[in-house]
Amino acid sequence: LGMHGRVAGSHLTSMHSMDNYYFSKLIGLMVEAEMNIIPNPLINITIQGKHDTYPKRRGMTRVPEQIKAGLNVAFGHDCVLDPWYPLGSHDMLEVAHMALHVAHLTGQNEMKSCFDSVTSTSAQVLHLDKYGLKKGCNGDLVILQCNNKIEALRLKPTRLFVIKKGNIISSAEPTEYQ
C-alpha cells in the first residue's frame, strides 16, 4: 500500500497489558511497517485501569521498548477540558514530564528523548518539512527560560517568547529564581 512511515498508532494502551511474548511479535511487525507511535500519557493513565481493582493497570503503552526498537515515539495530548480529562492544558512540556515518570524514562538520554517526543520527533511523525531553525523553515519556535532539554522538563520554565512565522505572538517576563 505504500504506507510505510505514514501510519501512526495512537494511545496503544492495550500494549501495556500484553505479555512479553505477544508484544515481541507485535513490535517486530510495527518496526517492519515503520509505524509511528503516539502515546497520550495524561489521558492514558487517567482512564486506563480506572475501574480496575488492585493491581491497577497504568495504561500507557511500552514506550521504552518502542524507542529501543527504533520506532518514532511522539507524545500526544488529545483530551482538553472534556469529560475524559478535565485537566488538559495543551502544554506539551507537561505531557513529556508525565511521560518520563510513567514510562520510567529518567536517565539523561531518556529525558532528552522525552523532550524530542514533543518537539522534533513529533514534527517528523507529522511530516512537517519546514520544522526547525534552518534557512527556509517557518521560524516557529518557543524560547524557554532554561539551559537545556532536561531543565525544560524539570523546571517547567517560563515561555519567554512564542514565535510564529518569525513574528513574536506572545512574550513573558523572565521568572526570578531564588
Q: What is each stretch, according to the model?
A:
Residues 25-26, 54, 90-92, 159-160:
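Short, solvent-exposed amphipathic alpha-helical segments in soluble enzyme
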Residues 17-18, 47, 109, 152, ...:
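Glycine/Thr-rich phosphate-binding loops of Rossmann-like dinucleotide-binding domains
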Residues 20-24, 86-89, 156:
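Conserved strand-to-helix beginnings and helix N-cap segments that scaffold or border functional pockets
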Residues 124, 135-178:
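C-terminal cap of metal-dependent C-N hydrolases
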Residues 1-59:
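Active-site core of metal-dependent hydrolases
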Residues 11-13, 39-42, 75-79, 137, ...:
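Active-site proximal loops enriched in glycine and acidic residues that flank catalytic Cys/His/Asp
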Residues 5-6, 47, 57-144:
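His/Asp/Glu-enriched, well-ordered alpha-helical/loop segment
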